[in-house]
Every structure is written in structure tokens, then in C-alpha cells.
């Protein structure tokens, strides 16, 4: 079977030892930092562009700086809590202190999304500003962070795809990745992280940019948020067909790792969590156009 060897890239950019402890800067952490900084600059540019708004930007630059702290907390706390509740609740109920070990990995986008949503609502209520226009700004600035995060997933050799015989299949390191039932030798897999980087990052960013800068969708509160939710939900739903499900869902009787199954068909946990996003996104877009 032909495959592409996994590139020899360390998950750690560099590490230092201080007082007997090792501290490392990982690509995943850098992706979070860079994504937040790029998103902040994009929101700042949209706030400063008067032509995008009918009655002016929904918040000031000073408010944006304060919001950034709330968003960071929402992403980290929501992402970790979402992983604990959605993917491994039984493990963390038995070992609750493991939920604090964020350095061991385990973040959920859907949980991070809910965390940011709660943070934005709380911030807007405190600052007495409209929620939907602020949500539109953050939605427009999110795809670059998603792109970088998925690239970091690839570098970390995690969240790889299902087995494939396609010529661009990648032989990810590790016995779990390279051993597949019914396949002799090294098992090549879909580089599903790169599929998601392209769809959730590049394609979704391009669509939102056109809607904002060419179509003026920021004048309709909630429209950009709806487009982001529906776009991300569709992208994630599609990629789930070739993405290897989380190990806790895979059993001998359920090799596809379906979280819900009926009549031989079913959905993965990622697809189940994406469907409400798609429906909510469609609702926001329809609501925005009706109230325009």
C-alpha cells in the first residue's frame, strides 16, 4: 500500500528546565495564541471600517481589549469542560482531578464554542451593548484560529482519519494509528486534520469575508453568526465521515464509533453536536434577513 510518511516534526517547539520542572512551548499552544491575536486584529479592522455598519460599530476598541480576556477564558474553560462532558464523562467522574490536567490534551471545539457564547453574553450584558453584532465580529474572526488549530492537530499526530487506500493517505506515528483491523502492514489514514483546516479555516474564512466586505452582512445582526455556525457545522459533519472516532466509542460491535445508531445507520458524536449548530445557523440567517 502506498502512503505518505508522516513528517518528522516535534510537537514541541522548544523546552526549558526550571527548578527541576520542564516547561515546553508546543505548536498547539502557539496556534491558540496566534489564532487569538489574528482574530483580535481582524475584529479591530472591522470595528474601524465605518462602511461595514449602518449605525456604527457595536463596541469601542477599549471594549474589544476587555472582551479578549473573556474570550480566552471561555475558550479554555469551555473547551476543556466540553471534552470532559461530551467525550469521556465516565472517566472524569471516576477521576475528577484529571479534568485539571489540560497539558495532557483534550479540548472540544463545541465546548469552546459554548464557553465563548456564555462569555460574550455575560460581557455584553455587563457593558450594555448588543449581543448579536459582537457575536458577528467574533464569528468572522474565528476561522484563522480554526485553521491553525487543525494544523497543530496534524503536527501532534492526533485526531487522524479513518483508514484509506488513497494516494495521499498518511502513515501517522504510533501503533494505534498504524494498526487497522483487516489491513496488513502499515495502515495509511485520511489526513482529516488537513481537510478540516481547509474547510473550517480557508473556505469558511473566504465565504465570511465575501459576505462581510462584498455583501454587507454586518448590517444585519446575527447573519454572519448564522453563516459561521451553519458553515462550520456542515464542514465538521462532512469530515466526520472520514475522521477516526474517539476511542471510547469504538467497540468490536461498533467499529465505526457511532454515538447514535438505528437500522444500520448512525451518527458520530461530532455529527450529533454539529446538527444543532447547522439548524441554529439557519435560524439566525433567516431571522436577520426578516428583521433587516
Curated annotation (Swiss-Prot):
It holds the Pfam family LGT. It is an enzyme of class 2 (transferase). One of its GO terms (biological process) is lipoprotein biosynthetic process. It comes from the Bacteria. GO terms for cellular component: plasma membrane. PROSITE patterns: LGT (PS01311). It is a multi-pass membrane protein. One of its GO terms (molecular function) is phosphatidylglycerol-prolipoprotein diacylglyceryl transferase activity. A 1,2-diacyl-sn-glycero-3-phospho-(1'-sn-glycerol) binds at residue 150. Its EC number is 2.5.1.145. Its main location: membrane. The keyword Thylakoid does not apply. HAMAP family: Lgt. This is Phosphatidylglycerol--prolipoprotein diacylglyceryl transferase.
Amino acid at each position: 500500500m502506498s502512503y505518505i510518511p508522516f513528517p518528522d516534526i516535534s510537537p514541541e517547539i522548544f523546552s526549558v528546565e526550571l527548578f527541576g520542572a520542564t516547561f515546553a512551548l508546543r505548536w498547539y499552544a502557539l496556534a491558540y495564541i496566534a489564532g487569538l491575536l489574528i482574530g483580535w486584529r481582524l475584529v479591530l479592522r472591522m470595528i474601524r471600517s465605518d462602511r461595514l455598519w449602518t449605525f456604527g460599530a457595536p463596541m469601542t476598541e477599549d471594549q474589544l481589549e476587555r472582551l479578549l480576556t473573556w474570550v480566552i477564558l471561555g475558550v479554555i474553560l469551555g473547551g476543556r469542560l466540553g471534552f470532559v462532558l461530551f467525550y469521556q464523562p465516565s472517566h472524569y467522574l471516576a477521576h475528577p482531578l484529571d479534568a485539571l490536567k489540560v497539558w495532557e490534551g483534550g479540548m472540544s471545539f463545541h465546548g469552546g464554542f459554548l464557553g465563548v457564547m456564555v462569555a460574550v453574553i455575560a460581557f455584553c450584558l455587563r457593558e450594555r451593548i448588543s449581543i448579536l453584532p459582537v457575536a458577528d465580529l467574533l464569528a468572522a474572526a474565528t476561522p484563522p484560529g480554526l485553521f491553525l488549530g487543525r494544523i497543530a492537530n496534524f503536527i501532534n499526530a492526533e485526531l487522524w482519519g479513518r483508514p484509506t487506500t488513497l494516494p495521499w493517505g498518511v502513515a501517522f506515528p504510533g501503533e494505534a494509528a498504524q494498526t487497522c483491523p483487516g489491513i496488513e502492514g502499515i495502515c495509511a489514514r485520511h489526513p482529516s486534520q488537513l481537510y478540516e483546516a481547509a474547510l473550517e479555516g480557508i473556505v469558511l474564512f473566504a465565504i465570511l469575508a465575501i459576505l462581510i466586505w462584498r455583501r454587507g452582512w454586518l448590517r444585519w445582526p446575527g447573519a454572519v453568526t448564522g453563516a459561521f455556525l451553519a458553515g462550520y457545522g456542515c464542514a465538521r459533519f462532512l469530515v466526520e465521515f472520514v475522521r477516526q472516532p474517539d476511542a471510547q466509542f469504538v467497540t468490536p460491535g461498533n467499529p465505526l464509533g457511532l454515538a447514535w445508531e438505528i437500522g444500520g445507520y448512525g451518527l458520530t458524536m461530532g455529527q450529533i453536536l454539529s446538527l444543532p449548530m447547522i439548524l441554529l445557523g439557519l435560524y439566525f440567517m433567516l431571522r436577520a434577513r426578516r428583521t433587516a
